[in-house]
Amino acid sequence: MTVTIKRAYDPASDADGFRVLVDRLWPRGVSKASAHLDSWPKDLAPSADLRTWWQHDPDRQGEFETRYRAELDGTPSAVAAVAELRAAIAANTKHGVRTTLIYGAKDPQVNHARLLAVYLAE
C-alpha cells in the first residue's frame, strides 16, 4: 500500500498519483483548479467538534488520535469512506499508482492526515 501525505499548499505533481483531500473544509486560498484532486471524502476528516477541541495542539495529539480513531471506527459514514478509500488504494497500488492524502494544516507532524495514513495501512 503506497500512501503519502502532502500539504494542499504544495504544488501538485504527477508523482502524487491519486490525490485525496482529507479535510472537511476547503483549504483557504487554494483554487480547485490548482488542487488537482481526484476525491474529497469529507467523512474521513475529524468532526467539527473534535477539530475545534484539538486545534492542532501537540499536547493533545495522543488524545486526539484516540478520539479520531473512535470516529473512524464508529461513525457509519466514516466507516464507509474508509472502506472505499482502502479499496481505491489497493487498486491504485496494484497499478503502481501512489495515493496522496492532501491536508491543509501547517505542521506536517501534527495533522490528522498523518494519523489517517497510518490507520489506512492497518
Which positions does each model-derived feature cover?
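Residues lining hydrophobic/aromatic ligand-binding pockets adjacent to catalytic sites
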Residues: 1-122
